[in-house]
C-alpha cells in the first residue's frame, strides 16, 4: 500500500519550476519576476544588448538599441499614461540628443533634447498649429526664436521662459509691424509701430501701451470762432496726451472735418431761427458740448489731402492708401448713420471726398480753405423777425416765416437786394448763424482698437465786411485772449434753460 501510494499524484505536492534565468547570448524572451516588464530581443553575456523590445504591463514600450542592459542608442519610446511618443536618441533610458516627440494632445517637436526635455535648437508645432523655431531651455522657448501664430502674426526675436522678452519684431497678419523691446509677452520699452491704418508711433511703451499716446483731439483758437460769410478759413488741430502735452510721437491718424448748423437759434445772436428739414431729409440731431443741438451741414476743404502714412523712425517707409470706407464717410456718420454715396446724392448730400480728411503729423494737423457751403436741398431756414418787427412796428413778437416770404437774412431790412456778384456769392454761402465744427477720428481700422473722441468748436458766421481777409486760427494761448479782446462786442449765448 505504501509503495503504491508513493507514486500517486495526490500524494505529491505541486511542482515548482525554478525561476528562468535571462538568456546568455543571442535572441531570447524574458519575463521579469515582477511580471511588469517583458523583453524580446538580443542578449549578450546575460544582458540586453543589441536590438530589442521592452514592453511594460501598462501598455508602454521601448523598441530600439540596448547597450549592456541599458536603453542607449536609437529607438522609439511610447508612454501609455500620456500617449506621447519619442523617436530618436536615448542615453540610459532617457531621450538625449536629437529626436522627434509626437504629442497625443496634438502637435510635435523635432530637435535637441536633454534628459527627456526640449533643450537647444528645435522646431515645435503646438496643438493649435502654431509653429516655433529656435532655442529651448528646460523644455521652454528660451533665447532667439521665430514664432508663427494661429492668427497669422509672425514674431522674430528674444524669448525668456516661454515669453517674448528682450528685442523682437512682430509682423501682424493685418500688416501692422512692431519693432522694439518686449517684457512678459507685451510691448515694453523703446519701440516703434507702423499700424496697418497708417498710424505710426515711435517712443516708450509701458505694459503694451504707448506711454505718450494721444487721448483727445483739440481744435485751436478762441472759444467761439467768428468767420465772415462766404470766406474760407483754416482749422488747426492737435492731439493731446492725458497731461496736456502734444502727442508728437504719433503720426498718421486720419481726421475728418465736418460741420453742423445750430438747430434752434436764439434771437439775440442770429436772425436765422432754425432750419426746417423736409421729412425726406430728416437728420438725427447731434448733441454738442455747447448746450444746444445741431444737424449735419456741408463743409469742404479742397486743399486738404490725405498723404500716405510714413513708417516709424528706423523702420521701412510704406505707402498705405486711405481706406476706401473713409472716402465714403459723410456728416451723418457722426451719429451712426450708414449711407452709400448714391443714397447721399439722392438726399441732396455730396458724397464725402478725401479733401475733408487730413492725416496727423507729429500730433498736429491743419485743414486749410475750409468753407461752409449753402444749405443742402431740403434745408429751409426760418427767420426770427422779432428785432425787425420791433423796429418796423410789425406783427407780434416771435413771429416765424419761411425763407422767401419776408426779407431774408441775406437781405437788408429795407428790402433791397445787393446786385451782381455779391448776390451770387451770398447765394452760394452759408447763412448767418450758429454752427459747429467737428473733428472726428476716422482712422480705419482704429489704432490699437480705439478711436479718439470727437472735438467740437463753436462757429459763428457773421456778415462779411468789405476787404476782410480769410480767417486763420492762430496758435497758443495769446491767440484766444487777443481774439476775445478784438471781438468783445459780441456777447456769448446764455446756457439754455
Swiss-Prot record:
One Pfam family named in its UniProt record: MORN
Name of the gene = MORN1
According to the record, where are the MORN repeats? Answer: 39-61, 62-84, 86-108, 109-131, 132-154, 155-177, 178-200
Domain of life here? Eukaryota
Region annotation Disordered: where it falls in the sequence = 1-27, 393-425, 468-497
SMART domains in the cross-refs? MORN (SM00698)
Report keywords, A-Z.
Repeat
Q: What is this protein called?
A: MORN repeat-containing protein 1
Q: Which InterPro entries match?
A: MORN
Q: What taxonomic lineage is listed for the species of origin?
A: Eukaryota, Metazoa, Chordata, Craniata, Vertebrata
Amino acid at each position: 500500500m505504501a509503495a503504491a501510494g508513493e507514486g500517486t499524484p495526490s500524494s505529491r505536492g505541486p511542482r515548482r519550476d525554478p525561476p528562468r534565468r535571462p538568456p546568455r547570448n543571442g535572441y531570447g524572451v524574458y519575463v521579469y519576476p515582477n511580471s511588469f516588464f517583458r523583453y524580446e530581443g538580443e542578449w549578450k553575456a546575460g544582458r540586453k544588448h543589441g536590438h530589442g523590445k521592452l514592453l511594460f504591463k501598462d501598455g508602454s514600450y521601448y523598441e530600439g538599441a540596448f547597450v549592456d542592459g541599458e536603453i542607449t542608442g536609437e529607438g522609439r519610446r511610447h508612454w501609455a499614461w500620456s500617449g506621447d511618443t519619442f523617436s530618436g536618441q536615448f542615453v540610459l533610458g532617457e531621450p538625449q540628443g536629437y529626436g522627434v516627440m509626437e504629442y497625443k494632445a496634438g502637435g510635435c517637436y523635432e530637435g535637441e533634447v536633454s534628459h527627456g526635455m526640449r533643450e537647444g535648437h528645435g522646431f515645435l508645432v503646438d496643438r493649435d498649429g502654431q509653429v516655433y523655431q529656435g532655442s529651448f531651455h528646460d523644455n521652454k522657448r528660451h533665447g532667439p526664436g521665430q514664432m508663427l501664430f494661429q492668427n497669422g502674426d509672425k514674431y522674430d526675436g528674444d524669448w525668456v521662459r516661454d515669453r517674448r522678452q528682450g528685442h523682437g519684431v512682430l509682423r501682424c497678419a493685418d500688416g501692422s509691424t512692431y519693432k522694439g523691446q518686449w517684457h512678459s509677452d507685451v510691448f515694453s520699452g523703446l519701440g516703434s509701430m507702423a499700424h496697418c491704418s497708417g498710424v505710426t508711433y515711435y517712443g516708450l511703451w509701458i505694459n503694451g501701451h504707448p506711454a505718450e499716446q494721444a487721448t483727445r483731439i483739440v481744435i485751436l483758437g478762441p472759444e467761439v470762432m467768428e468767420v465772415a460769410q462766404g470766406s474760407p478759413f483754416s482749422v488747426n488741430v492737435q492731439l493731446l496726451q492725458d497731461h496736456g502735452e502734444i502727442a508728437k510721437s504719433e503720426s498718421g491718424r486720419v481726421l475728418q472735418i465736418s460741420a453742423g448748423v445750430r438747430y434752434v437759434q436764439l434771437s439775440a445772436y442770429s436772425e436765422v431761427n432754425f432750419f426746417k428739414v423736409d421729412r425726406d431729409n430728416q437728420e438725427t440731431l447731434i448733441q454738442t458740448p455747447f448746450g444746444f443741438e445741431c444737424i449735419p451741414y456741408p463743409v469742404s476743404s479742397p486743399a486738404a489731402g490725405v498723404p500716405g502714412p510714413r513708417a516709424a523712425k528706423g523702420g521701412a517707409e510704406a505707402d498705405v492708401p486711405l481706406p476706401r470706407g473713409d472716402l465714403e464717410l459723410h456728416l451723418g456718420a457722426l451719429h451712426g448713420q450708414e449711407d452709400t454715396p448714391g443714397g447721399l446724392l439722392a438726399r441732396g448730400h455730396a458724397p464725402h471726398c478725401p479733401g475733408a480728411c487730413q492725416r496727423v503729423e507729429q500730433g498736429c494737423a491743419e485743414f486749410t480753405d475750409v468753407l461752409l457751403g449753402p444749405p443742402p436741398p431740403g434745408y429751409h431756414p426760418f427767420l426770427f423777425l422779432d428785432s425787425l418787427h420791433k423796429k418796423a412796428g410789425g406783427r407780434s413778437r416771435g413771429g416765424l416765416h419761411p425763407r422767401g416770404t419776408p426779407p431774408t437774412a441775406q437781405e437788408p431790412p429795407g428790402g433791397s437786394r445787393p446786385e451782381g456778384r455779391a448776390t451770387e456769392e451770398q447765394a452760394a454761402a452759408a447763412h448767418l448763424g450758429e454752427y459747429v465744427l467737428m473733428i472726428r477720428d476716422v482712422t480705419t481700422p482704429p489704432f490699437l482698437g480705439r478711436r479718439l473722441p470727437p472735438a467740437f468748436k463753436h462757429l459763428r458766421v457773421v456778415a462779411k465786411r468789405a476787404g476782410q481777409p480769410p480767417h486763420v486760427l492762430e496758435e497758443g494761448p495769446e491767440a484766444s485772449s487777443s481774439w476775445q479782446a478784438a471781438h468783445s462786442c459780441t456777447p456769448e449765448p446764455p446756457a439754455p434753460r
